[in-house]
Amino acid sequence: MDIRAAEISAILKEQIKNFGKEAEVSEVGQVLFVGDGIARVYGLDNVQAGEMVEFPGGIRGMALNLESDNVGVVIFGADRDIKEGDVVKRTGAIVDVPVGPELLGRVVDALGNPIDGKGPIKAKERRRVDVKAPGIIPRKSVHEPMSTGLKAIDALIPVGRGQRELVIGDRQTGKTAIILDTFLNQKPIHDNGPDKDKLYCVYVAVGQKRSTVAQFVKVLEERGALEYSIVVAATASDPAPMQYLAPFAGCAMGEYFRDNGQHALIGYDDLSKQAVAYRQMSLLLRRPPGREAYPGDVFYLHSRLLERAAKLNDENGAGSLTALPVIETQGNDVSAFIPTNVISITDGQIFLETNLFYQGIRPAVNVGLSVSRVGSSAQIKAMKQVAGSIKGELAQYREMAAFAQFGSDLDAATQRLLNRGARLTELLKQPQFSPLKTEEQVAVIYAGVNGYLDKLAVNQVGKFEEGLLASLRTEHKDVLEGIRNEKALTDDLKAKLKAAIDAFAKSFA
């Protein structure tokens, strides 16, 4: 074989010319101990709190505890594949997720990876999951209604855009159903309404069964509501760090709409399970436990999440993010640690009660204990006009009903009040998946507070309401359109509505 020196030198020169001088420097550490979704890592001296680190096999983790001789890392994934002595790399990045309209109609995990089998998500933007909430200056007080389609809520405990309204109750009292109905109620606006009124929905499922989440997504899909919704799921089988992260990830996705002058609604279902996951992580990281073994900063965990729901002022695009956090109580005990924390953070709460639920009053809202601290500024004028009196009448009814159990001989006025209260309570019942438009609610409640139901038997109230709505939708569309456009009951509209109800009441009798 003939070796030519000139050729070899030419090849060597070519190779040397193309030699890159960049040496890759990455800070690495070693796993000392791993288990229960937590790894103790030695090394990584300059790692920052909350920074993402990478384990072999592409599994990510987040540095939470920075101690003198090691770093406590929570693992976003299965810890089965990580072993002692594995090399851990710093990434220099804080946890972020994809955001934007590309996520609408998709189901993702807490890191924004699709889990619905519909292929990758081509999002153009990513956002950090844990950012500071808007300050005082960019905010504006809540003044636009966020209609849920449920008479009991829109009339008595109105929720505004940018508000945080807690949904609290025992298991199986219909908490998720309220969020689901609110999502479905946005469908008509997305189909026909102006862009500025559209409300994009984000649902965060924390620690739920996979079958429950699948059922929720199926209902959204069947009713055409998935196209404007994002579902973030960290189910019961996911590691605790994913359940802790999911609400923050969902919030970042909702904030994208808020900061672009649009409106979003986010339901956290539920924050009790997030607190339990956070407690598990904290105890495994050897942080000192406090009341009910929760760590000392569990209040801050929820307050920094819920403060990100806000209504921004016009200079900042006038967008909003409304939050409906869910808390599950045990035995109606709202004075436990997590329920009292979240009640004090939110702008009101919707109490759901088991005994009301089993009496057939659904949604099982306890109207006496539920409040909205935004109140009637989150209602259109027409709703204020009819709902003002229903609140008072129901309050009197509850008071009288308690006394009426003792006395048999009641005067006519008390009897009238009890009759009216029973019929109004019946009127506020509503089957699931049948949200009503605001103008339809106004018409129905107007009939209730003006005595049209008083002569009916209680079991006829539902039929009367159905018939009245059918009549208004077909023969008196102008009345409903008038209320929708005017947003108030003018004398002219009132006369038309009264005539329509009178005509129907005659035929119903």
Curated annotation (Swiss-Prot):
It holds the Pfam family ATP-synt_ab. It is a peripheral membrane protein. Belongs to the ATPase alpha/beta chains family. Produces ATP from ADP in the presence of a proton gradient across the membrane. The alpha chain is a regulatory subunit. Transmembrane segments: none annotated. CDD domains: ATP-synt_F1_alpha_C (cd18113), ATP-synt_F1_alpha_N (cd18116), F1-ATPase_alpha_CD (cd01132). GO terms for molecular function: ADP binding; ATP binding; proton-transporting ATP synthase activity, rotational mechanism. It comes from Brucella ovis (strain ATCC 25840 / 63/290 / NCTC 10512). GO terms for cellular component: plasma membrane; proton-transporting ATP synthase complex. Gene3D superfamilies: 2.40.30.20, ATP synthase alpha/beta chain, C-terminal domain, P-loop containing nucleotide triphosphate hydrolases. HAMAP family: ATP_synth_alpha_bact. Its EC number is 7.1.2.2. The record marks 370 as: Required for activity. Signal peptide: none annotated. InterPro entries: ATP_synth_asu-like_sf, ATP_synth_asu_C, ATP_synth_asu_C_sf, ATP_synth_F1_a_nt-bd_dom, ATP_synth_F1_asu, ATPase_a/bsu_AS, ATPase_F1/V1/A1_a/bsu_N, ATPase_F1/V1/A1_a/bsu_N_sf. It is found in: Cell inner membrane. It is an enzyme of class 7 (translocase). F-type ATPases have 2 components, CF(1) - the catalytic core - and CF(0) - the membrane proton channel. CF(1) has five subunits: alpha(3), beta(3), gamma(1), delta(1), epsilon(1). CF(0) has three main subunits: a(1), b(2) and c(9-12). The alpha and beta chains form an alternating ring which encloses part of the gamma chain. CF(1) is attached to CF(0) by a central stalk formed by the gamma and epsilon chains, while a peripheral stalk is formed by the delta and b chains. It catalyses: ATP + H2O + 4 H(+)(in) = ADP + phosphate + 5 H(+)(out). Keywords: ATP synthesis, ATP-binding, Cell inner membrane, Cell membrane, CF(1), Hydrogen ion transport, Ion transport, Membrane, Nucleotide-binding, Translocase, Transport. This is ATP synthase subunit alpha. ATP binds at residues 169-176. Its main location: membrane. NCBIfam families: atpA (TIGR00962), PRK13343.1 (NF009884). The gene is atpA.
